[in-house]
Regions:
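N-terminal carbohydrate-binding accessory modules
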Residues: 1-67
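Substrate-binding cleft and catalytic face of glycoside hydrolase catalytic domains
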Residues: 23, 62-137
Length: 137
């Protein structure tokens, strides 16, 4: 039987679009937009209105992860939640507060956060206006 080294880190991974959905966001990302155009492209037509409900249940979810021995969680921050105005880069304080509470809850449960700033979820406004990452704007 294989045994893991004592310093092996058991972790989990998700992304903002997968776990938070579009609850209480000012903007759509490309996944939110895609779902409005073609819900049948998503498994069982489950889209950003449903997701795993982490946005509302993160405190309990993180407690369960702690109880399961999870020591690290990789997730992403959705620009469509964090940024209020994409031209001025004004931060959406409610979005920033949400991510702050999530990170605090991770740390309180002994879970090291690994944060990804882009999980293929560009705000659709930037995609439409500038053509996405190909733009030099």
């Amino acid at each position: 039987m294989y045994t893991f080294p004592k310093n092996f880190v058991w972790g989990a991974a998700t992304s903002g679009p997968q776990s938070e959905g579009n609850f209480k966001k000012r903007h759509q990302n490309v996944f939110d937009y895609w779902y409005t155009k073609d819900p049948s492209a998503f498994y069982a037509s489950v889209g950003p209105d449903t997701t795993s409900n982490f946005y509302n249940d993160y405190e309990n979810d993180l407690k369960l992860m702690h109880q399961a021995g999870i020591k690290a969680l990789r997730t992403s921050i959705q620009w469509s939640r964090l940024i209020a105005d994409f031209e001025t880069c004004e931060v959406d304080q409610k979005g920033a507060d949400f991510y702050s509470r999530v990170i605090d809850a991770m740390l309180a449960n002994g879970i090291t956060p690994y944060i990804n700033l882009c999980h293929f979820d560009m705000p659709v406004e930037l995609q439409h206006k500038y053509g996405g990452f190909e733009s030099k704007h």
